[in-house]
Design a protein with these regions (language model features):
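Active-site bordering "gate/hinge" segments
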Residues: 1-178
């Protein structure tokens, strides 16, 4: 299983220029059929999808032209614990992200009188989850989320023009520091 959510907002000239929210999820199945490993995947989660997955595994195994055998990984006895910084992506509102994006753009414009344009100010967030299970008892799950911000600016000083930007990829919303 894999699933995730994403959010993206961009500002230009004090207004929202782009706004996207998306969710996706899917499940993949691998299995042996006729001595060969087949695989199939779907983004549907209904009774018909189960039948289509099974039929897809059979069909893909039948179409294989190699005699090489894939192996279903039985897993390890132990896995290391990965320390992750706690994220507040799930509890941060769209309104707060929009406000932060507009603020990033406004502060970039106001930072120096030589700044003539802020062509990009963006705030995004993403979260994802992956679950791996198999017939040997493997049952692993991982999830994560983060924010992303980007601001670019154009400055002029006489005949000289400079372009610069700032990127942040924090786990917590307050890590996006204008």
């Amino acid at each position: 299983y894999h699933g995730g959510d994403s959010f993206n907002v961009s500002a230009l000239d004090g207004e929202i220029s782009d706004y996207k929210v998306a969710s996706s999820c899917g499940v993949s199945l691998r299995g042996m059929f006729g001595g060969k490993m087949g695989s199939a995947s779907t983004e549907a989660f209904d009774a018909d999808a189960v039948r289509q997955l099974i039929d897809g595994v059979k069909e893909s195994a039948t179409l294989l032209e190699t005699d090489e055998q894939d192996e279903i990984f039985a897993g390890e006895e132990r896995y290391p614990t990965i320390e992750k910084e706690e994220s507040d992506v799930a509890t941060t509102s769209a309104e707060a992200k929009i406000e932060k994006c507009l603020k990033l753009e406004a502060l970039a414009k106001a930072a120096d009188p030589r700044i003539v344009r802020v062509p990009s100010a963006m705030v995004a967030s993403s979260s994802s989850e992956v679950i791996l299970r198999n017939s040997y008892g493997l049952n692993l799950q991982d999830s994560g989320s983060y924010f992303f911000s980007y601001t670019s600016l154009v400055a002029k000083d006489g005949a000289s023009t400079a372009v610069n930007g700032k990127v942040a990829v924090p786990s917590r919303f307050d890590g996006i520091d204008p």
